[in-house]
Amino acid sequence: MRETRSLDYFLLTILALIWASAFFNIKIATYSYGPLTIAFLRIFFGAIPVILLCYIKKIKIEAFSKDWYWFAAIGIINLVIPFFLIAYGVQKIQSNLAAILMASTPLTAAALAHFFTNNEKINLVKSTGVLIGFSGIVFLFSDNILINENNIFSAFLILFGSCFYVIGGLLTLKISNKKNENVTASILIWGTIILMPVSLFLEQPWNLSPRLDSTLSLIYLGIFSTGIAWLLRFYILKHNGLVFQAQVAYLIPIFGVILGFLILNEAI
C-alpha cells in the first residue's frame, strides 16, 4: 500500500457516485427483470468493455490459467452473490434505503481486515474514525431508515450482500500482484459463466417484454456500475487497502438519497 493522496480521495468519490447511481437503476431494472437476470446481464455487460480494454492494452486475461480458482471464487463472492441479493432486496425497499444500508460495510471491513491482513490492524484512531463515520450516516439519514415487518427481510439481504463485497475484497488482496484489468475481466468472465445457465433456467428472460427504461438501466449497471466501477475498486484496493476502499460506503448514502429523490421522487 502507499500513502493516501488527493487523487485517491477523488477516485473514491467517483466510485461512490457510480455505485450510488446503481441503486435507483437496479430499482428501475426490477420493473421488468428478475434478480437473477439483473445480476447476470449486469456482469455480462460489464465484462464487454473491460475485455475490450485488455485487448487494446494487450493485457493477458488469466481467467482460465492455473489461478482460475481465485477468479472463480472472487467472481462468485464479489459479484454473483451480492448482485443477486441486492437486486432481490431492492424490489421491496426504496433505493435510497438500500444505499444507506451499505454504510455498514466499513464496520465489516475493519473487523475482517484486522484478522485477515497483516498491515490493516485496528487501532484507536482507525476504529474511532469508522464508528464516527457510521454514526454520522445513521444520524443524517435516520428519517430514511424505515425498516418494518414488510421489508426487514429485504433489508437483511442487502446487508448480507454488502458483507460479501468485503469478503471478496479480502480475496482480491491475495492476487494484488496481478494487473487490475486482468483481475476485473477474469472475475467478470467467471461471473457470467456461473450465472448464465442459472438465470436462463430459473427466470427464462426470453419470455419477458421488458420496458425500455429497465433495459437502459441494466446496460448502465453493466458498463458503469460494474465494469468501470470494479476497475476503480480494484485499483483502490491494491494501492490503499481494504479499509480505505470500504469508506466509499459512507459517501454512497449521500449520493444515493439525492439521486433517489431526483430520479424516482423518493422521500428525503
Roles of regions detected by a PLM:
Residues I18, A22-F23, I51-M102, S135, ...:
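Specific transmembrane alpha-helical segments of multi-pass solute transporters/efflux pumps
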Residues Y31-I48, Y88-P106, N151-F164, R211-T226:
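Structural signature of hydrophobic alpha-helical transmembrane segments
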Residues A39-L41, L79, F83, L97-S104, ...:
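Helix-helix packing/entry segments at the starts of transmembrane helices
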